[in-house]
Amino acid sequence: MPIGVPRVPFRTPGDRDASWVDILINRLYRERLLFLGQDVDSEISNQLISLMIYLSIEKENKDLYLFINSPGGWVIPGIALYDTMQFVQPDVQTVCLGLAASMGSFLLAGGTITKRLAFPHAMIHQPASSFYEAQAGEFILEAEELLKMRETITRVYVQRTGKSLWVISEDMERDVFMSAAEAQAHGIVDLVAVE
């Protein structure tokens, strides 16, 4: 838990002992404000997925807001989170604060089209694929699966950005850092907040 987040004791009816509740975090969740401020891994992905599903069941016509400041992360938990964003009934508005790199960029692009925003000084980084980093034995065993995941991510970017397959494929072959305005021109976000 972050330093300075207020907590209060709360007793659930029927429980003998009180437990500590994070007031601020619960309040933000009730307002449908979700935060990805770390690498995408199984734990944060599962937390965000469960919150999105719970909040969409609770009120299916009120938008969810996913604030992203992430250096990237694991592919499979990221794709699971992306799929959930597409599945839930409410629109998911994505907002880039600071950095949305690799899987963070993928999730930023996965927000509801016309509701993807980046702050003016945000940096967006397209995912780069570096298959050569794995050891040879692992590479041979996992190459087919890696190629399938790469194709999936590439197709999603093509669909979400409106760019051609060759442009997205070329971008994924090299490190591409973009400003918020460049990300808007590239179709990853729809709006750039004004200063």
UniProtKB/Swiss-Prot annotation:
Keywords per UniProt: Chloroplast, Hydrolase, Plastid, Protease, Serine protease
Entry protein name: ATP-dependent Clp protease proteolytic subunit
Subcellular location: Plastid, Chloroplast stroma
One CC-aspect GO term: chloroplast stroma
Family: Belongs to the peptidase S14 family.
One Pfam family, short name: CLP_protease
Protein role: Cleaves peptides in various proteins in a process that requires ATP hydrolysis. Has a chymotrypsin-like activity. Plays a major role in the degradation of misfolded proteins.
MF annotations from Gene Ontology: ATP-dependent peptidase activity; ATPase binding; serine-type endopeptidase activity
Active site: 102 (nucleophile), 125
EC number: 3.4.21.92
EC supergroup of this enzyme: hydrolase
Source organism phylogeny: Eukaryota, Viridiplantae, Streptophyta, Embryophyta, Tracheophyta
Annotated GO biological process: protein quality control for misfolded or incompletely synthesized proteins
Catalytic function, reaction form: Hydrolysis of proteins to small peptides in the presence of ATP and magnesium. alpha-casein is the usual test substrate. In the absence of ATP, only oligopeptides shorter than five residues are hydrolyzed (such as succinyl-Leu-Tyr-|-NHMec, and Leu-Tyr-Leu-|-Tyr-Trp, in which cleavage of the -Tyr-|-Leu- and -Tyr-|-Trp bonds also occurs)
Subunit (UniProt): Component of the chloroplastic Clp protease core complex.
